[in-house]
Design a protein with these regions (language model features):
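Carbohydrate-binding surfaces of carbohydrate-active enzymes
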Residues: 275-299, 312-318, 548, 552-649
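Glycan-recognition surfaces
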Residues: 304-318, 405-419, 462-568
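Intrinsically disordered, low-complexity segments enriched in serine, threonine, and glycine
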Residues: 339-344, 382-390, 394, 811-921
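Bacterial N-terminal signal peptides
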Residues: 5-16
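Carbohydrate-recognition beta-sandwich/jelly-roll modules
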Residues: 25-247, 251, 269, 277, ...
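Aromatic-lined carbohydrate-binding/catalytic grooves of carbohydrate-active enzymes
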Residues: 221-318, 402-448, 452-455
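Autoprocessing Asn-cyclization modules and mimics
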Residues: 295, 299-389, 655
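Beta-rich carbohydrate-recognition modules and glycan-binding surfaces
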Residues: 626-833
Length: 921
C-alpha cells in the first residue's frame, strides 16, 4: 500500500513538471523566468550563472480589490501580450513583458475590472544583498545589482526585507503604468539605468552636455550664504578663497516671502534686474549660482495668506462650527470632539502640527484644546497672520491649515502648485541660475503618500526650466532620483560637529546616497560665530572636514552668512586651509592608499605629510593639576588653553534652582519595554505655554492644556549654562559592567535640547558639576531612540534665554534594582574670571604665557610657531614668542599643573601627533 502511494505521488510530481510551462525573458546580463502560475522561479546572472531569487518564491503579480490581496493564479500568452489571471478575484490583467538588451519592461495594458485598488507589477524576493538603495529602488553588492525603475512618478518601488516591489494604484492611475527590471553585474549598473532613462523617456538631465551625475560640477563645492547685491563682491571673495565653484543664496535673502516669492528689494533693490545682475557678476568671476527654496511652503507673511488666504492652501483636518461666532470671541466650539487636531507647534519633523485654523477668510490661532467634551479651541487669536477678524455662522467649516516649520503648505492637487513652479522656473530661466536646492521637500508628504507627493513640486519646476541645472534637495523618491544631481548630507550641527560628521553625515546620509548610486557632498556644514549655545568654528574642525572630503573624494557645502564670516576672526585662515585641501582633492594628488587611511581618525596636514592628531580636552583650575596621556612618542608640548567662566558656589543667591531640595525625585530603572536610549524618567516643566505665535509646549502631557492652567514663563539661563546636580545612588551595577548614564536635558522653545550626561559609577551621595553640555558623547554612545527625541534637535541651535523644561532621561539603564535619587539641580551663575599670566608646568619645565586671558579667550600653540591669543570669536589679540625651551611631553601618562595669578579655571586641549604618512606632491 505504501509503495502504491509513493508511486502515485511521484507520478503526480512528474506530471506537474511535464505540464508546467516556464516563460523566460533575457537581457544581455540576466535571465528572468516566470512559470505559468505567475511565480518567479529564477533570476539568473547569465555571465556567472548565479541565482538571485529565493527558492519557492511567492507570486510575481498581486492585486488588491475591496481591501483584500489576491495573488496571481495563472500566466499565459495572449498574442503580443501576457495575461495574468487572479482567479479568486475574478480579474485579469493584460501586460506587455518586453526584454531589451539592458532591461525588461513590464507594462500594464488593461485591467478587466475598474474596482482594483492596486497592482504589484513586479515582486522579487532576493538572496541577501548587503546594499539597500531605497532612493533608487535597488538591492546590490559588489558583484550584482537588481533594480525596479518606475517608468513614471506613479509607480511605488520599495526595497524592504530583501524584496523589490513595484506597485501602481488606482488613485494615481493603473493602465499604462510600467516598470523596468534591471539585473546586471554592478559594474554595468549605471550604464543600464541610463539606457532605461533614454529608451523609456525618463528624466535624464545634463550639465554642459554631460549626464548630470557624471558632470565635473558634481565634484565641486558650493558656498551657501546670504548673497545680496550689496555684499556680492565680499561674498565672491570668500567663496574663491575657499575654492568654491558655486554660490547659493537663501530663500529669505533673494525672496521676501515663501509661496509667491516676490523679490526681496531690501537685498536686490531693482528687483529681478538686481538679482540677474548679481548672477551675472558671479558668472564673470567664474562662479555658478544656486537658488534655495522651501518646497511648496507658504509663509504666513506672503500675499497668498494675507489679507485673504488663498483657497488652495493645504488643509489636513476639519470640524464644524457649533454656534454663531462674532469677531471677538476667543473660545470657538465645534460640533464634535477635536481629538484629531494638533496640540504641538509645527517645529521639527513631518507630523501633523500647528495651531492655525481657517474659517471663511479669517485665520485664527488657538492656544489649547479643551471645554466640555474636548470640542473647543481655547485662547484664540482672531484675525491671525494679517487676516481680518469677522463673524461666522453656525455650520461653517473649520479647516486646520497644514503647517511645517512655521509655514503653511501648497495643496499640490490644485493649480497653486503650477503657479509656484512657473514663478521659480521663470526666475531661474530669466536670471540665469545654475542650481536649485529643494529644501523641505519631505514635508509634502502632508498631501498624501510620500513616495508620490514629495516629488510633485520638484518635478513640475524641473520640467519648466530651460537651462542646465544642478539639482539637490531633501526628501528624495525613486522618481526624483532621476532629476537630482547629487545629495546633501543634512543640516549642520552647532555643537559636536566632528562626531556629527562621522556618526551621522557619513555613516547615515553619505552612505545612504552611495547605496542609491547618488553622488553626495558632505554639507551642509556650519561656519559659525560664537554664541551662548555654540562656539565659533575653529581650524581643527575645518581640517577634520577637509580630511574627510579628501578621503571620500566628496565635496562640501558651507552654510553660513556674511555676519558670521566677519565675526569669526579666523575666517580667512580657515577658508585658505579649506581651499588648499580642495585643490589637493580635485588634482588627485594624494594616492588612494593614503586617502583610505584618512577616512578614520583625526589627521593634521603639515607640508606633504598627514599625521594622526589627538585633541584631548580636560578642565583644570589654577593651582590644580590633571593627568594627561600621550599615546604617541615623546614630543614638544602643544596645546590650546581657554579661560572658562567662573561658577558661583552651590546655593548662591544668583543661581537658578531647577529642582529644589525639598522635592527630590526617585528614579527607577526604565521598563524593559521602554525605548532606549533616552527613555524619559522625569520631567520638570517651567512653563506650560510660551507666548510665541508659533509655540505651545505640552511635551509629555497626557492631554491638551485647558484654559484654567497657569501659563508660566521660560527661564533665562544664558548666563547659567552650567548645572550642579546632587545625587544619591544605590545598588551599583556589577563590577566591570558599564555604569548607568543619566541625561539632565535642558529643553528650549521649539523642541530643541542640550544634553548633560552623568555616569552613575558610584554609590552614595555626590554633587556633580556639569560645566557644559556633553553632546559629543551622544552619537558614538547614546543615539536616542526616535520615539524619545530627535538627536539632531540636541545638536542644532539652542536658546538658553527660553528654557521651558528639564528632562531627566536614561541613556544607559542600570540593573533592575538600581535607584537614583535626584536631590537638587541648580543652574550655576557664570562669573567673569580672567586667567592672568597662566603657566603650565610639566615635570620640571614651565611654559609661561605673559598675557591675561579674558573669559573665553584662548591661547594656542602648535606646529612650533608662535603662541597666538584669540578672543572667543577667533579675533587675534596677541602673538607671543614661545619659551626657548618648550617642555617635552613624555609618552604615556604624565601630570600638568596650571598656575595663574589670582586663580581662575581653564579648558586645556592637549594636542599630540603620531607618525606621519608622506605623499609626493
Amino acid at each position: 500500500m505504501k509503495s502504491c502511494i509513493l508511486w502515485l505521488a511521484c507520478s503526480l510530481a512528474l506530471l506537474t513538471t511535464v505540464t508546467a510551462e516556464d516563460f523566460t525573458f533575457k537581457t544581455s546580463t540576466a535571465q528572468l523566468t516566470l512559470d505559468d502560475r505567475g511565480f518567479c522561479t529564477s533570476l539568473r546572472d547569465t555571465a556567472g550563472g548565479a541565482e538571485w531569487v529565493i527558492e519557492k518564491l511567492g507570486p510575481f503579480f498581486t492585486l488588491r480589490k475591496n481591501g483584500v490581496n489576491f495573488p496571481v493564479t495563472r500566466l499565459a500568452r495572449l498574442g503580443a501580450n501576457w495575461r495574468a489571471e487572479f482567479g479568486a478575484a475574478g480579474v485579469t490583467a493584460d501586460l506587455q513583458i518586453s526584454p531589451q538588451p539592458d532591461f525588461i519592461r513590464i507594462q500594464l495594458v488593461r485591467l478587466s475590472s475598474p474596482d482594483i485598488e492596486s497592482l504589484e507589477l513586479a515582486r522579487l524576493a532576493l538572496r541577501p544583498l548587503k546594499r539597500n538603495g531605497s532612493w533608487l529602488g535597488a538591492l546590490w553588492d559588489e558583484r550584482f545589482a537588481v533594480a525596479l525603475l518606475g517608468l513614471s512618478d506613479c509607480v511605488n518601488v520599495t526595497t524592504g526585507g530583501g524584496r523589490l516591489t513595484a506597485t501602481v494604484y488606482r488613485e494615481f492611475g493603473l493602465e499604462g503604468q510600467g516598470v523596468a527590471l534591471i539585473a546586471t553585474p554592478t559594474a554595468n549598473f549605471l550604464k543600464q539605468i541610463r539606457a532605461v532613462e533614454h529608451e523609456c523617456g525618463l528624466p535624464s538631465p545634463k550639465i554642459d552636455g554631460v549626464e548630470a551625475k557624471q558632470s565635473p560640477d558634481v565634484r565641486t563645492d558650493y558656498f551657501f550664504s546670504n548673497l545680496t547685491e550689496q555684499n556680492a563682491d565680499e561674498t565672491i571673495h570668500y567663496a574663491k578663497l575657499g575654492g568654491f565653484r558655486y554660490l547659493m543664496t537663501y530663500d529669505g535673502t533673494w525672496a521676501r516671502s515663501l509661496g509667491s516669492y516676490p523679490i526681496n528689494t531690501n537685498n536686490f533693490p531693482r528687483g529681478e534686474e538686481s538679482l540677474k545682475a548679481v548672477v551675472d557678476k558671479c558668472h564673470a568671476a567664474g562662479l555658478k549660482v544656486g537658488m534655495h527654496m522651501l518646497t511648496s511652503f507658504v509663509g504666513k507673511n506672503d500675499p497668498l495668506v494675507r489679507p485673504i488666504p488663498d483657497a488652495r492652501l493645504l488643509k489636513d483636518d476639519h470640524a464644524t462650527l457649533a454656534a454663531d461666532l462674532d469677531a471677538k470671541v476667543q473660545e470657538i466650539t465645534a460640533t464634535a470632539p477635536l481629538t484629531s487636531f494638533p496640540t504641538e507647534g509645527a517645529f521639527y519633523g513631518a507630523a501633523k502640527a500647528g495651531f492655525d485654523l481657517q474659517i471663511d477668510d479669517e485665520i485664527i490661532q488657538y492656544r489649547a484644546i479643551g471645554g466640555t467634551g474636548t470640542n473647543s479651541f481655547l485662547r484664540c487669536i482672531r484675525g491671525f497672520a494679517g487676516t481680518k477678524a469677522a463673524p461666522h455662522k453656525t455650520g461653517t467649516p473649520i479647516h486646520h491649515l497644514a503647517e511645517r516649520y512655521g509655514s503653511y503648505l501648497v495643496d499640490l492637487r490644485t493649480t497653486l502648485k503650477n503657479e509656484v513652479s512657473e514663478r521659480i522656473a521663470g526666475i531661474i530661466n530669466r536670471c540665469g541660475f545654475d542650481m536649485i536646492y529643494f529644501d523641505g521637500g519631505e514635508c509634502n508628504s502632508a498631501n498624501g503618500p510620500s513616495w508620490y507627493w514629495v516629488s510633485q513640486q520638484q518635478r513640475d519646476i524641473c520640467e519648466r526650466v530651460r537651462r542646465p541645472l544642478l539639482v539637490q534637495g531633501s526628501g528624495g523618491t525613486p522618481w526624483t532620483w532621476h532629476w537630482f544631481t547629487r545629495g546633501c548630507c543634512d543640516d549642520f550641527a552647532a555643537i559636536a560637529p566632528k562626531q556629527y560628521l562621522d556618526w551621522h553625515k557619513i555613516a547615515d546620509s553619505w552612505q545612504a546616497y552611495r547605496n542609491s548610486f547618488m553622488p553626495a557632498e558632505l554639507g551642509w556644514w556650519g561656519f559659525l560665530a560664537w554664541a551662548p549655545h555654540q562656539p565659533a568654528t575653529t581650524p581643527d574642525e575645518v581640517e577634520f572636514y577637509a580630511v574627510r572630503m579628501l578621503a571620500l573624494d566628496s565635496p562640501v557645502s558651507l552654510e553660513t552668512n556674511l555676519k558670521a564670516l566677519q565675526q569669526n576672526g579666523r575666517t580667512q585662515e580657515m577658508l585658505r586651509l579649506l581651499g588648499d585641501f580642495e585643490q589637493l582633492r580635485l588634482n588627485g594628488t594624494v594616492p588612494a592608499s593614503i586617502r583610505d587611511k584618512l577616512a578614520i581618525g583625526e589627521w593634521h596636514r603639515i607640508d606633504n605629510t598627514f599625521r594622526p592628531v589627538n585633541y584631548a580636552v580636560t578642565r583644570i583650575s589654577a593651582g590644580g593639576e590633571c593627568a594627561v596621556t600621550n599615546a604617541e612618542a615623546a614630543q614638544p608640548l602643544q596645546f590650546r588653553l581657554q579661560c572658562v567662566p567662573g561658577l558661583a558656589p552651590l546655593g548662591a543667591a544668583t543661581n537658578r534652582v531647577l529642582l529644589p531640595a525639598a522635592e527630590p525625585l526617585n528614579l527607577l530603572a526604565p521598563s524593559t519595554k521602554a525605548a532606549m536610549p533616552g527613555a524619559l524618567a522625569a520631567r520638570i516643566e517651567f512653563t506650560k505655554a510660551v507666548g510665541d505665535q508659533f509655540s505651545v509646549f505640552m511635551v509629555g502631557q497626557p492631554s491638551p492644556a485647558t484654559s484654567g492652567e497657569t501659563v508660566g514663563k521660560p527661564l533665562d539661563l544664558q548666563h547659567h549654562r552650567a548645572l550642579a546636580v546632587h545625587l544619591c545612588v544605590t545598588n551599583a551595577p556589577p563590577v566591570g559592567a558599564p555604569p548607568p548614564v543619566l541625561n539632565f536635558q535642558l529643553e528650549a522653545g521649539g523642541k530643541v535640547y542640550r544634553d548633560y550626561y552623568v555616569n552613575l559609577d558610584f554609590v552614595g551621595e555626590r554633587t556633580i558639576i556639569l560645566p557644559e553640555p556633553t553632546t559629543e558623547r551622544m552619537l558614538p554612545e547614546f543615539r536616542p531612540a526616535p520615539a524619545n527625541y530627535a538627536f539632531k534637535a540636541a545638536m542644532y541651535g539652542f536658546n538658553y534665554r527660553s528654557v521651558i523644561a528639564l528632562n531627566l532621561r536614561w541613556m544607559r539603564a542600570g540593573p533592575a534594582n538600581f535607584v537614583c535619587t535626584v536631590k537638587q539641580v541648580e543652574a550655576l551663575a557664570e562669573l567673569d574670571a580672567p586667567l592672568k599670566q597662566p603657566t603650565l608646568e610639566l615635570g620640571s619645565d614651565k611654559f609661561t604665557l605673559p598675557v591675561d586671558l579674558g573669559t573665553e579667550d584662548y591661547a594656542e600653540f602648535r606646529d612650533s610657531t608662535d603662541v597666538r591669543v584669540f578672543d572667543k570669536q577667533g579675533k587675534l589679540l596677541q602673538t607671543i614668542h614661545p619659551p626657548n625651551r618648550v617642555p617635552q611631553l613624555p609618552a604615556n601618562t604624565s601630570r600638568i599643573k596650571l598656575d595663574a595669578t589670582g586663580g581662575g579655571s581653564a579648558k586645556l586641549t592637549l594636542i599630540t601627533l603620531g607618525e606621519p604618512l608622506k605623499y609626493s606632491p
